[in-house]
Each structure stands twice: as C-alpha cells, then as structure tokens.
Amino acid sequence: MKLSQLSILFILLFIHSFVQANPLKVGSWMGNLNLQNTHELFFQFEVDPNQKITIKNGGEIVEMKDYQIENDSIKVYFTNFPNYLIFKVDPLNENKLSGYFVNPDRKKHSRIEFKAFFYDDTPVIDIRYKHENFDGKWQVTFNPNTEDQYPAIGKFEQVNNKITGTFLTETGDYRFLKGTVINNELWLTSFDGAHVFLFTAHLINDTLRGEFLSGNHWKTDWIGVRNDDFTLKDPDSLTYMVKDDFKFQFKNLNGQNYVYPNQQLKGKVVIVQILGTWCPNCLDETKFYNELYDQFHNDGLEIIGVAYESPENFEDQVERIQRYIDNKSVPYPILVGGRASKTITSKDFDMLNKVSSFPTSIFINKDGEVVKIHTGFNGPGTGEIYEEYKIETIQMINRLLIE
C-alpha cells in the first residue's frame, strides 16, 4: 500500500513539474470547442514569448490574463469576463492541449470541451471548390415561423473562401464573426470570452438556410435572402417613457445610496447607461463612452452606469463592477443595479415601457428632460454603421451642451 501511494505521489509530482517546466509552446495554435456534441467551433490563438495568450476573433484581438498552475492543469482567465480556459498539456506531445472552456455563472451547460493543437499559421486558399459568393447584405430571420422569430441583417465580406461580418438585430449586433465558405456552405464563428457562437448555412435557390448554436445551451434555425433595402426598427424608437419623471435610487460601490436627479447634476447633460459587465456589447459601448467622457466631461457631460450582474449578493456584484472599471479605466461612476434580469431592470426603470436589451442608454438634456433612449448597441463589428452612430452621438452631445 505504501509503495502504491508513493507511486501515485511520484506520478502527480512528475505531471506537475512537467507543466511548470514546460510552458506553452510559443506561436500559433488552433483551438476547438465541441458544441452540443454535434458541431465544432475552431478559433486561432497566439502564445508569445512571455506566455501571454491572445485570441484572434474576427476583427478583434481578445486578451487573456497570465495563466496559473492549478494542480496538473493550466488555468487562464479572460481579461474582460469571469470565464476561463482550463486545460492540460499532453505529457507525450507538447503540441496538444485538452480541457474545458468554463462559464462559472451558468448553472447548467457551464463547460464546453476544449482542445487545441500547434500549427503553422500560413494562410491557405482552398482552390478545390467553386465557392458561392455570400458577400453583401442579407435579410435574416432567426426562429422562423415561430412565436419567437426575430429579424436581423446579415452583413458579410468575402475574399476567396474566407468570410467575415456580423448580424445586426434590434437589440444589438452579434459582434465580430469570421469563417469559411466551401461550395454552397457557410460557417461563421465568434469566441470572445463570453459569446460562443457558430452559424452554419447552405445556399439553396438564393436562400440561406442554417443553424445558430450558442454554446451548449441553445440552438435555432435561421433563413436569409439578399435584400439591400431591408432595415430594422430604429433603435431609438423601441424604448420610451411611460411616466413623466425619470428618477432612480441605487447603491454605489461603497454601499451608499445614490439618487438621481441630484443637485450635482443640475444643468448637466447626462447619459444613463444600463449595462452588465458580462455583456460584450456593453463593453463595446463602454469603450465608446470612455471616449465621449474624455472629450466632453469638462464641457458638462456626465455619464452614470447602472450595472446588473450575475452574482446574487451585493459584495460579489461590487467586485465584478470594480474589476470592470479597473480593467477598462472607466472614468465615470457605475452603480449597483442588482441581479442580471430584464424583468428586474424593467421594474427598477418603470418609467420606461420596458428594458429589452443590455445595454440601453438614456440621454438627458440640461433641463433634466429625456431626449433620446437608445436600445442595444451596434459596435465596431458593424464597420461603417458603428462609425456613423459615433458621429451622430457626438453631434448630439455637442448640440445638447450648447443649448
């Protein structure tokens, strides 16, 4: 028995020392997430000489924190979210990794099987097939022919058999997508540390028909047809006031009550941002609001965030919000709204018809009047649509400040 215990201890020490003595191989890796045991989502990541890991997610680079050794495994947290990868290096092959992507906030389907292999990052153009052209604007319906169907715009750019783009919905975009085309088949993916999205489709008689998978917990059908004239509802029209007064009270990160309106904001232009630190679209909006604040704060612009978080208790909610503020150098205050729930948020902001999206922003003039409510956020993944929105918002803030 003693010999057996010593043998086990020796093996564990050997594996632990192997992980410590053999850092991740520097260079390009191909990751693979097993979705619902039916599909695979591939993504690229890099390991630099300092062992920093960055994921290539379409048009953005997703940073990860320095990894830590946990027993015989390596655990790496995403910078912007509480999610992480935990994996082992194959002791017989340093070019292979295996483990899981974990979302600790999910009570069900919190783990997705993860594998990776080291590879030569040389672009390959597949010339074996005659590829269909998916470039352009598509009118899309998710959950078609059901009570839950909703419209979207597919916006794609294709070069040879490589494709990038996004889907815009009435509550925001699906951010940076990239993928591959083979014959009449389309694959688009996103893995940004929060979203785990896979879109597949076949082009049949000018119609796209496919599936949309989100992690291990959700799957739906979608269809699309080309339509350059198709538009979604105006995001400034979806949320509106149903009571005269816009007011609220929440606790700040120190547990003190914060009441709006207040004397300090009298005569100021104010943006109230309803968000969650778990929300990638909210992060896109926060980055833009950081720019707005830096540009216009001295002229009289104030921004107040109200965050709704996944943890149930106040202390953990504060920790999430404080980490978000620190990581992104957010210059404006963010209050604690409570649990992440559109029902709870709609009850807290009962002067609105509803809160249908994180984020939602309320724009208020110097007289304390709500002049605009913007639902959702179409971020940098939408290209010129995002740039146009930035210009429009800056022009509006300028106008409100001089009125």
Could you tell me what each predicted segment is?
Residues 357-403:
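Thiol-/selenol-based redox modules, centered on thioredoxin-like
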Residues 258-283, 289:
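Short active-site neighborhood of thiol/selenol oxidoreductases, capturing the structured segment around
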Residues 226-262:
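N-terminal "domain-start" segment that seeds a small globular fold
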Residues 30-90, 124-125, 132-200:
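Central antiparallel beta-sheet cores of small beta-barrel/beta-sandwich binding domains
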Residues 329-333, 352-362:
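Structural micro-motif
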Residues 19-30, 117-139, 158, 236-242:
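N-terminal helix-cap/turn-to-beta initiation motif at the start of protein domains
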Residues 284-329, 341-348:
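Structural microenvironment flanking redox-active thiols in thiol-disulfide oxidoreductases
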Residues 1-28:
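Bacterial Sec-dependent N-terminal signal peptides
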